A protein has these predicted regions:
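Short acidic, glycine/serine/threonine-rich helix-capping segments at coil-helix boundaries
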Residues: 374-379, 387-431
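Proline-rich, low-complexity linker regions of envelope-associated factors in Gram-negative bacteria
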Residues: 19-61, 362-364
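Non-catalytic peripheral regions of nucleotide-handling enzymes
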Residues: 21, 382-385
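Mature N-terminal segment immediately following signal peptide/propeptide cleavage
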Residues: 55-89, 94
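Catalytic glycan-binding domains that act on GlcNAc-containing polysaccharides
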Residues: 80-312, 325-329, 336-354, 358-376, ...
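Bacterial N-terminal signal peptides
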Residues: 6-16
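Positively charged n-region of N-terminal signal peptides that target proteins for export
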Residues: 1-3
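A general alpha-helix detector
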Residues: 67-71, 138, 175, 254, ...
Length: 432
C-alpha cells in the first residue's frame, strides 16, 4: 500500500505495482503517468546511474549511528524493549542505495494505456485465474467474512507482488532506519520504523524475516508497518498475522479487511466503461459532480453497447485520457481502492484486472496511443504558464492533480476548447 492519509498504508508510489511484472517488462521503461491525474507509478525502479557502486563514507555512517543511538532512547519511552531493540537494530548501517532509489524519478513518464498493458496483461490475467482456482476455498471464505469480492482481492495481490512472486527482499528495518535518518520524509519513516519494531516485539515476525520493498512495504499485499498494525488479520488462526510466508492467506484476508473497513460495498462496481454522447458537457466530467446512472443515462451517457448502467449509487465521470480514449463512470468503491493506493492509474488497474478475472471484456474504446505524456519539467512549465495568466494551479509541483485539472479546464473554457481537463502537449504548446 502506498499512501499515508490518516494512517492509511503508504510507500513510495513509484516503487510499486508492475515492478512485480519484471519478466514481462523490458529494462528502462521508467514510470507511468496518468495523463489526467499526474501520479507516477513505477514499472521498475532503476537506480541511476546504473551499475554505480554506492559507498557510504565513514563520516556519513558515524552520523547515522549517532542518530540511531538517539532513536533508541526515544523509542524506549514508547514501550519498545531493550531486547527488541538489540535484536532489531544490531549491525544496521546507512544504506545509500535505498536513498538513491527514493530519489529516483524518471523525467519522462508513460501514459496510462501502457501501464494497463502490463497491469492487465494476458499473463497477469492467466496467473490471476490460476491463483483464484488454487485458493478458491480461502478466497471464498474471505469474501464471505469481509464482503469484498475475491476477484478484487486477487487483483490487489496481482498488482502488488504478481501473486506473491515478487514480495521484495530488502530488510524492512534497515530500509526504514535509512529513510528515517534521511531528512526528506524523516517523520513518516520514523513512524513506520517504530511500528515495525512493535510488530517484532509482538512476535508476529523476526527482524530477519521482516522483508519487503526498499520503501518498507511488506508481504504479499505490501502493507506498510502502521497499516499492518491497524488492519492485518490472523485469518488462518495460527496466532500470528503472517503476511510474509509462502501461504498468502493472512495477507489476502488483511487486504480484504482493509477495504471493508474503508467502506467497500459488495456488488457495487468500482467503475463502468461508458460512451459519451455528442455534445456532452465535459465540464461535468469531474470527481465532485455526481449523478445516479439513470440521470446520466438521461443525458445520453450509456455503456458502449447502448445500455443504461444499473443504479449502484451516485457516480462521477472520469476521463483518464481527456476527451479521447476510455470514459468511466466511477462509484464509491473507486474511492475505497484509492485508500489502498491513491493513484487513479492504480485504481483503474485494480478495477479492470478484477473485472477481467471475473470474465468481463477489455475496454472497448481505443486509447490515444499517439499522445506523448508531458515530462516532469513540462508539467511544471504548464502549471507555471497557467498560473501566470490567471488560471491558478495552486502549486508548481509537476503533479497533475485536481487543482491543475480544474485550471486546465477553466483555460480551455476561456479559449473555446473542449474542456476535458487534459494536460496535453498540444495544450502546453498553445500556452507557449
Amino acid at each position: 500500500m502506498h499512501r499515508c492519509i490518516s494512517g492509511v498504508m503508504t510507500a513510495a508510489l513509484w516503487a510499486s505495482v508492475v515492478q512485480a511484472e519484471s519478466l514481462e517488462t523490458p529494462d528502462g521503461l521508467g514510470s507511468i503517468q496518468l495523463a489526467s491525474a499526474g501520479v507516477a507509478v513505477s514499472i521498475r525502479p532503476v537506480v541511476r546511474p546504473q551499475f554505480k557502486e554506492y559507498r557510504v563514507s565513514t563520516e556519513g555512517n558515524a552520523r547515522f549511528q549517532a542518530w540511531l543511538g538517539a532513536f533508541r532512547e526515544r523509542v524506549r519511552a514508547q514501550g519498545i524493549s531493550t531486547s527488541t531493540l538489540d535484536r532489531s537494530l544490531a549491525g544496521l548501517t546507512y544504506d545509500k542505495k535505498i536513498i538513491a532509489r527514493d530519489r529516483n524519478q524518471a523525467e519522462f513518464s508513460k501514459p496510462i494505456w501502457e501501464y494497463l498493458d502490463t497491469a492487465v496483461s494476458d499473463a497477469r490475467i492467466a496467473n490471476g485465474r490460476a491463483g483464484l482456482e488454487q485458493y478458491q476455498t480461502t478466497l471464498t471464505r474471505i469474501e464471505a467474512q469481509y464482503g469484498v469480492e475475491k476477484e478484487v482481492v486477487a487483483a490487489i495481490w496481482g498488482l502488488e507482488t504478481s501473486f506473491g512472486t515478487f514480495r521484495g527482499s530488502d530488510q524492512t528495518i534497515q530500509s526504514l532506519a535509512t529513510l528515517a535518518f534521511d531528512a526528506r520524509r524523516a517523520q513518516f519513516f520514523e513512524t513506520q520504523l517504530v511500528a515495525a519494531l512493535q510488530i517484532v516485539q509482538a512476535g508476529d515476525v523476526s527482524p530477519t524475516n521482516m522483508v519487503g520493498s526498499w520503501a518498507g512495504a511488506m508481504g504479499h499485499t505490501q502493507f506498510m508497518p502502521t497499516s499492518y498494525l491497524d488492519h492485518a488479520v490472523d485469518f488462518d488462526g495460527d496466532g500470528r498475522r503472517d503476511i510474509w510466508s509462502e501461504n498468502p492467506t493472512d495477507a489476502l484476508a488483511s487486504a480484504a479487511a482493509y477495504l471493508a473497513r474503508h467502506g467497500w460495498t459488495k456488488g457495487q462496481p468500482w467503475g463502468v466503461e461508458v460512451r459519451l454522447p455528442e455534445g456532452f458537457d465535459y465540464a461535468t466530467a469531474k470527481r465532485d459532480y455526481t449523478l445516479t446512472p439513470s440521470e446520466w443515462a438521461a443525458r445520453g451517457v450509456v455503456t458502449p453497447d447502448g445500455r443504461s448502467v444499473p443504479d449502484h449509487g451516485q457516480a462521477a465521470i472520469l476521463l483518464p485520457a481527456g476527451g479521447q480514449g476510455v470514459a468511466l463512470m466511477i462509484f464509491d468503491n473507486f474511492k475505497v481502492i484509492e485508500a489502498y493506493n491513491g493513484a487513479d492509474a492504480y485504481v483503474i488497474g485494480i478495477g479492470h484486472l478484477s473485472d477481467r478475472l471475473a470474465g468481463h471484456t477489455p475496454f472497448q474504446a481505443d486509447w490515444p496511443r499517439g499522445d506523448r505524456v508531458l515530462s516532469f519539467t513540462e508539467r511544471k512549465e504548464l502549471q507555471t504558464r497557467l498560473t501566470q495568466i490567471g488560471f491558478d494551479t495552486q502549486s508548481i509541483d509537476g503533479r497533475i492533480g485536481p487543482n491543475t485539472i480544474n485550471a486546465v479546464r477553466a483555460y480551455q473554457l476561456a479559449q473555446g476548447l473542449l474542456p476535458d481537463g487534459y494536460a496535453s502537449l498540444n495544450l502546453l504548446e498553445r500556452l507557449r
